[in-house]
Amino acid sequence: MITVENKWLDLLGKCILTLYLYLISYFYTLSYPWSWSAPLRLIGFGILVHVACEALKKIRITIRSEASKWSWRFGAAVFGISMILLGVYYVAFYPGGIIIDSFNQWYQVQTGVYVDWHPVVHTLLFMKLPSLICNSLAFVNFVQMLWISLAIMYLGMVMKHWGIRRKYVIIALLLALTVPASGMVLSFCWKDTALTIFVIVLAAQMIEIICSDGEWLCKWSHVLELASASVMAMLMRHNGILLVGPMLFFLVLFFWKKAKKFCIGTVLLFMVLVVGIKGPFYRLIHVQSHSQVSA
């Protein structure tokens, strides 16, 4: 039985998805978002979203009331599939793509002079650390491929953990990684790819929280995991707060009664980590600020 509250949430979700698809469409067509075609596009996307959502509602996927044991064998399979699919693009674009943003960061790695024009945390984690093992852009891109595959492995295991059938997980994985745009973009070592990795981790953690009705969050070790992933996602892009901020807001809003102190702890730890990294840590490694930043 669908309650009035759920109907409003359903409508809100459809409106948000419609607006998202409408705005995204202009990134591909490079046309002006407020052109004469705007009403037609909105109506078209609205109909598409409504039909798709109603069709998906008819699919019954059983979610366990309690999580099952972790299936590491299945996780290894997901990891292997991800590595193979991404590996095809890695070989095709060897030694990996690089754009002007990444080239600037790679130059900072070689000189040891860091400027917060692009997120320094991304420069350090995804370029500097791998370069200490092998100072090669090809190796840096390979390590990034490993991180992507591990993140997808974690998400797949969480979905299986809560009763999603293996075939649905594999289908979702194949749909995500066989799209050429995904494979090509993930072949570039840049901040958008790094953000994607941590968004995948956050998505898995949100599944844990929602499916457990907040119980997953009621452990301080999980608070640390969620806060850390949120910090990393935010620091991969200068506008990362636009993603993490609303996520934490809704986390507190929906789970305040069931996990009040853990919600507060997550937000406070998140703030402390951000201040600590962008304050004392940046000063320690002499990060130079910039009057303008690239989001």
Name each model feature, range by range.
Residues I47, F142-G163, V201:
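Transmembrane-helix motifs of polytopic, lipid-linked glycan transferases
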Residues L242, C263-A295:
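Juxtamembrane membrane-water interface segments immediately following transmembrane helices
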Residues F93-Q105, V113-F126, C134-A138:
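Extracytoplasmic catalytic/substrate-binding loops of multi-pass membrane glycan-assembly enzymes
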Residues D10, L155-P180, I197:
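Transmembrane-helix signature of polytopic, membrane-embedded enzymes
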Residues H222-R237, L248, F270-V274:
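Membrane-interface alpha helices of multi-pass inner-membrane proteins
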Residues M1-I24, S31-L86:
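Start-transfer (signal-anchor) and selected internal transmembrane alpha helices
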Residues Q110, Y154, T196-G214, S230, ...:
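Specific aromatic-rich, kink-prone transmembrane helix
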Residues F27-S35, V91, V120, C134-L137, ...:
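Aromatic- and kink-enriched transmembrane "portal" helix at the membrane-lumen/periplasm boundary
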